[in-house]
């Protein structure tokens, strides 16, 4: 019985954390970005499915990348995503995205969420 209760608590806690991270993504990113595998719906930003580990400006269904991001040569790893989400325009001047998230805990949760999209 104790094992069942502990398992249930862990399951519920995990679901609460997933829901919180999903809400953070919706609030901060979903207006401009899809995260559905294969979604080619035109939005203000590229689909973020599989973004972690991908070279910037290579999501083929998105065609509105700035020259600055095309020429950046960066790969979206945790370090680069954190800099990008802190201040995209300062990290890659000339980009079309001007998102800034001062709260590091929010940035890290969004990055953790993006890492699951594969």
Protein language model features and the residues they cover:
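Sec/Tat signal peptide C-region and signal peptidase I cleavage site
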Residues: 12-19
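Sec-dependent signal peptide recognition
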Residues: 1-8
């Amino acid at each position: 019985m104790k094992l069942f209760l502990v398992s249930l608590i862990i399951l519920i806690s995990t679901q609460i954390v997933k829901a919180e991270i999903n809400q953070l993504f919706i609030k901060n990113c979903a207006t401009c970005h899809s995260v559905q595998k294969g979604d080619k719906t035109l939005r203000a930003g590229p689909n973020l499915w599989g973004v972690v580990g991908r070279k910037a400006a290579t999501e083929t269904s998105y065609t509105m990348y700035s020259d600055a991001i095309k020429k950046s040569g960066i790969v979206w790893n945790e370090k680069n995503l954190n800099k990008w989400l802190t201040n995209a325009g300062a990290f890659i001047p000339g980009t079309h995205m001007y998102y800034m998230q001062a709260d590091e805990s929010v940035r890290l949760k969004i990055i953790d969420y993006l890492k699951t999209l594969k």
